[in-house]
């Protein structure tokens, strides 16, 4: 069975490739989407790739993923550090989440060191640039195989 992964991207990620390339790299969000689609095909995953600058959209998409029994690979961007709403959406949707960040949030400003999402994520990948998305997809594919082997759904963190 092919598992769906919602690849959710938070605020300002639509500016990738232009915004602080020394921190976030030169890959655009379109580049990342294309590489995710290629990787997903090899991993027998289906992806639904989305971006919004609005917190409520991310909350609604997390809830939708839960309703569809999909996984979530999320780069919440700045909402990592501020959004209890996204934390609560993940917890209430009981969805399997991998959090990804292009930069190493722990090597940056102190206010970026804490993520509300990490507490409810299955795992966190940060500091590997656009490659982090592919690592996240591989992790979710491994979880899907384990679930299929055991005939179960691994929900939440």
From Swiss-Prot:
The record marks 19 as: Transition state stabilizer. InterPro entries: DHquinase_II, DHquinase_II_CS, DHquinase_II_sf. The keyword Nucleotide-binding does not apply. It is an enzyme of class 4 (lyase). The keyword rRNA-binding does not apply. Pfam families: DHquinase_II. One of its GO terms (biological process) is amino acid biosynthetic process. The active site is at residues 24, 101. It comes from the Bacteria. Substrate binds at residues 75, 81, 88, 102-103, 112. SUPFAM superfamilies: Type II 3-dehydroquinate dehydratase. Keywords: Amino-acid biosynthesis, Aromatic amino acid biosynthesis, Lyase. Its EC number is 4.2.1.10. Disulfide bonds: none annotated. GO terms for molecular function: 3-dehydroquinate dehydratase activity. NCBIfam families: aroQ, PRK05395.1-2, PRK05395.1-3, PRK05395.1-4. Homododecamer. This is 3-dehydroquinate dehydratase. The gene is aroQ.
